[in-house]
A protein has these predicted regions:
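Catalytic cores of nucleic-acid ligases and guanylyltransferases
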Residues: 1-312
Length: 312
């Protein structure tokens, strides 16, 4: 069951609200004491997540009989700033060799956040309202899997997740039944867009040209220097492209101004510039090593790079 996008958190006693995790959606099935993990596309991904597909006895301590379960949730891992980050999971997602998966799990442990109970001891719960499924889920001991708490106040959760740099909020109607593979209006998701300022360190032209600016490479000033955060192309075109071309004219330099290595795919064809121009960028979430779905919002002529230290 998938959520539809919304522009506002719904209000009312018929809604419950959860943190929107930046992870990988996984169905976990326990049968005859064995755990199998399934992707949204119904692929068996058990081997990729040995720290999630634990032996059944580890899930239900003291259990004297096999417990039949089917739960829905999200696998997450934390980045260097302590935030759930889909990007850090990418090296693990497609692993098909058990030894490789075990090695990666040791260096980058994952956590399974369970938010729905679909079957227990042979009983199909998908026809029950969410409120009942959630109550049944809360009564189970699934440690070390985690069952995050839902919230009644969606607006409070929206502001809290925004302040903490989390991805957003998912709101669910308490009366909703579970439908596999369906995108439902009874589940709604809202991802935060954050506006922050960054320093331009380079630009790339439109494909097939050498002088039509199409994207900017931007960074964040730190005590160690300008750290690369990503390439911004959305929102740049037409008059904006011409204006930015004029803004970077005369700023060209021979080498990258970033203290860390810019990925080859971003550096290719880049004209490096002196790091003096500041722009505003809208992006999903904060606290990530790279900007997520960034969009250009404008030049900040009132700011210089030193002013951005207060953003951290």
């Amino acid at each position: 069951m998938l959520a539809t996008k919304t522009d506002a958190v719904p209000v009312g006693a018929e809604w419950s609200h959860e943190v929107k995790w930046d992870g990988v959606r996984i169905l976990a099935e326990v049968t005859d004491g064995q755990v199998r993990l399934w992707s949204r596309n119904a692929n068996d991904v058990t081997v990729a997540w040995p720290d999630v597909a634990l032996p059944h006895e580890a899930l239900v301590p003291g259990s004297t009989r096999p417990r039949d379960l089917l739960v829905d949730g999200e696998v997450i891992a934390l980045n260097e700033r302590g935030l759930p980050d889909f990007r850090v999971l990418q090296d693990r997602m497609h692993v098909r060799r058990a030894s490789t998966a075990t090695r990666l799990a040791a260096g980058l442990p994952a956590t399974y956040m369970v938010f729905d109970l679909l079957r227990v001891d042979g009983e199909d719960l998908t026809g029950l309202p969410l409120s009942e499924r959630r109550a049944r889920l809360a009564a189970l001991d699934l440690a070390p899997w985690q069952v995050p708490e839902p919230y009644d106040d969606g607006q409070m959760l929206l502001e809290a997740t925004r302040a903490q740099g989390l991805e957003g909020v998912v709101s669910k109607r308490l009366s909703s039944r579970y439908t596999f593979d369906a995108r439902s209006p009874h589940w709604r998701k809202l991802a935060h867009r954050h506006r922050r300022s960054y320093v331009v360190g380079g630009w790339r032209p439109q494909e097939g040209t050498s002088d039509r600016l199409a994207s900017l490479l931007v960074g964040e000033p730190t005590a160690d220097g300008l750290v690369y955060r990503g390439r911004v192309g959305s929102g740049i075109g037409g008059k904006v492209s011409r204006m930015l071309t004029e803004a970077v004219a005369g700023l060209t330099r021979a080498s990258s101004p970033f203290v860390d290595e810019v990925p080859r795919v971003d550096a290719a064809g880049t004209t490096w510039v002196e790091p003096v121009l500041v722009i505003d960028v809208d992006t999903h979430g904060v606290g990530y090593a790279r900007l997520r779905q960034p969009s250009y919002r404008g030049v900040r002529e009132d700011l210089d790079p030193a002013d951005l230290e207060d953003q951290s």
